[in-house]
Amino acid sequence: MKNKLFIILIIFIILKIVICQNTTPSKLIPQQQQKQKQQQTQPHHHHHHHQQHQQHQQQHQPNQQIKQQQQPQQQQLQQQQKQLEQQQQQQKIQQQQQPQQQLLQQQQHFPNSQNVIKTPPHHTQQRVPHHHGPNGAPHHHGPNGAPHHHGPNGAPHYHSPNAAPHSGHNTQGHVQTNHVNNINKNNINNNNNNNNNNNNNNNNNNNNNINDNKNIRNNIPSPATKDPNPFINNKPKVNSNTPQPFPHPPHNHNLVNGGRPVIHKQIPPHHHIPMGGGNIQSNQHFQGFQPSQVFTGSQPSSNSASPILFNSENPFYKEEYYKHPEKQVERKITPIMVLYILLASTMVIQLFIMVFKQVKHIREINAKTTMESLL
């Protein structure tokens, strides 16, 4: 917006200068006009020859000046070309070195990366981390609503295409490939077994989830991580096997289009608290489903905490996101913008006045000439 206004201002200034130079009325004295007419009718040959000689000298001098000016410009261009070539070579070297450095970092950060099951073919083969949200921040879900990470080397997780809740993340944040396809007890038990097999601590993931849910309000360290809950006092969970998590922008998952996540900007921030096999019990998350339809696996125990959604205990909760979605699009009018608008409007008015004056002046001259010709 500011750039456009600035460009418009520059155009107005140039137009004003051009109009001033081209349309300034030449108020010549009548005696000078007569002299000019006499000079036109009586040409002087000697004077004309002298003028030609002066013009020839003037034409010869700028050629020398142009040659002198062109030499340093050519040198500067050569230097710039050399610098560009050097920069391109450095960029090529950096691009070659980057993948090697990334591999080394991943191996140091995730020692157990070889044991992780690869993702299904509907994801990218390069195992690039996927991102949700307007500013491309990775989102994370954890066993009790805490942020978790997907895969040791950035493998994206996926959701089953038949609108089933996703599950199968173990305590280290590794993605399991056999997500729930049909909601029944056998599939949920299989997911739990896979979680237990891939868990380095050999803990029961289902029990850890329920214990973590119970400890949300008691601030007791969970048995899986021995850390206090990450959502108390907004302290993020730090685990030796996973990088430090951070909050994510509001997002939602579309479970119709092949289970791929799709962004809906007006959905408020949320997180998941899986219960009994890592399923999500939330009528607000899956619109059009009743909790009894969505959650048909092993029922949660009576001691487990209810999902924390849309309330003050959730640090990602913000009323503005879903009560006032128009606030996100609102643009503030800065004093600089007001100044630009004022300047532009004054320039437009000045241009109109100048054009009007010039037209009036031309009409007056035309009227005078016609009167003189009639007389």
Curated annotation (Swiss-Prot):
Positions with biased composition (Low complexity): 30-42, 54-74, 181-220
Membrane-side (Extracellular) residue stretches: 21-335
Entry GO CC: membrane; SWI/SNF complex
Region (Disordered): 30-74, 113-253
Keyword annotations from UniProtKB, A to Z: Membrane, Signal, Transmembrane, Transmembrane helix
Compartments it resides in: Membrane
Ranges of compositional bias, category Polar residues: 168-180
Chain ranges on the Cytoplasmic side, renumbered to this chain: 357-375
Main location: membrane
Gene Ontology MF terms in the entry: nuclear receptor binding
Protein name, per record: Uncharacterized transmembrane protein DDB_G0281039
Transmembrane domains' residue ranges: 336-356
Any single biological process term in GO: negative regulation of DNA-templated transcription
